[in-house]
Amino acid sequence: MVVNFKIFKKASPNNMVTLYMNRREFVDSVTQVEPVDGIVVLDDEYIRQNRKIFVQLICNFRYGREDDEMIGLRFQKELILVSQPVYPEQKIDIQLTKMQERLLKKLGSNAYPFILEMPPSSPASVVLQQKANDSTQPCGVQYFVKVFAGENDCDRSHRRSTVNLGIRKVQYAPTKTGIQPCTVVRKDFLLSPGELELEVTLDRQLYYHGEKISINICVRNNSNKVVKKIKAMVQQGIDVVLFQNGQFRNTIAFAESSEGCPLNPGSSLQKIMYLVPNLAANCDRAGIAVEGDVKHKNTSLASTTLIASQEARDAFGIIVSYAVKVKLFLGALGGELCAELPFILMHPKPSLKAQPEAETEEA
């Protein structure tokens, strides 16, 4: 049986250092993260010169616009999560993956493996979408595997002998789903003997990207007010942990309905509204959280960020959440009544299938 696979390849500008990786997405299961593994191939000249080669896992966190930077002030942090020498070889035992074993046989004696352990508390790959004509670096969290030649791992790397390959830290939907989301809110009014009650229920807690969200709405009007209109929204919550006031929300899908309205005192109404949150409807809006961009990779809305606890939040990260919000409009003097239900929006875990044919992609 022949197993086919895809390999990502990127060489330094001087072609002396080449990086091979069989994947660019590494799964975070909350308690642990898949190790980052690959192969570095060196030119014969670097071997003869006994040049020192290092590999690093870099987390790049940009928290401000590049256009707003001034001399001596940068809104960017580059964090070295892991640093490891590749050549000369160190006397350490590495548990090679099957893919690394195959690549070592194919690439020859100038190939050297590495495995980098990503900290479980490191933030997920998330960037904030920019305007279409904005060519600056986006705000958010991005990861890179960096291979360079230098005297030590703190040495300033030269561009001609450096390889940077973007990767992503991703989370997939859990296998166990939570309880069905449901909430009931009530509002009483001055000089009104009764209450206005709004009950909102979702058909489930977990949704995959592109799926339709079914919102069951039940209104019981025991007050003397009149419900004029109903509006349902899907909101994306973004929490930039570094800032105390770094929380904001974006409405990424909404629908309004006047069917069954006006809802007079003593009446009730039950209806279902459907919403589909997707990036296609928000592709021109700045500030929407999307999955960290990787070359040749179609992106989507950022998935819900799963963390073990609030204390485990990384200071250089962005926490993404989603909620359905239903609002009843009661007119100019009556005000509004709102109900909110959080839910999880993620990708399903892909099945492990072989690629249709073997290929090496230039990154």
UniProtKB/Swiss-Prot annotation:
<dbReference type="Pfam" id="PF02752">
    <property type="entry name" value="Arrestin_C"/>
</dbReference>
<dbReference type="GO" id="GO:0002031">
    <property type="term" value="P:G protein-coupled receptor internalization"/>
</dbReference>
<dbReference type="Pfam" id="PF00339">
    <property type="entry name" value="Arrestin_N"/>
</dbReference>
<dbReference type="InterPro" id="IPR011021">
    <property type="entry name" value="Arrestin-like_N"/>
</dbReference>
<protein>
    <recommendedName>
        <fullName>Phosrestin-2</fullName>
    </recommendedName>
</protein>
<dbReference type="GO" id="GO:0001664">
    <property type="term" value="F:G protein-coupled receptor binding"/>
</dbReference>
<dbReference type="InterPro" id="IPR011022">
    <property type="entry name" value="Arrestin_C-like"/>
</dbReference>
<keyword id="KW-0716">Sensory transduction</keyword>
<dbReference type="GO" id="GO:0005737">
    <property type="term" value="C:cytoplasm"/>
</dbReference>
<dbReference type="GO" id="GO:0007601">
    <property type="term" value="P:visual perception"/>
</dbReference>
<comment type="similarity">
    <text>Belongs to the arrestin family.</text>
</comment>
<dbReference type="InterPro" id="IPR014753">
    <property type="entry name" value="Arrestin_N"/>
</dbReference>
<keyword id="KW-0844">Vision</keyword>
<dbReference type="InterPro" id="IPR017864">
    <property type="entry name" value="Arrestin_CS"/>
</dbReference>
<dbReference type="InterPro" id="IPR000698">
    <property type="entry name" value="Arrestin"/>
</dbReference>
<dbReference type="InterPro" id="IPR014756">
    <property type="entry name" value="Ig_E-set"/>
</dbReference>
<dbReference type="InterPro" id="IPR014752">
    <property type="entry name" value="Arrestin-like_C"/>
</dbReference>
<dbReference type="GO" id="GO:0007165">
    <property type="term" value="P:signal transduction"/>
</dbReference>
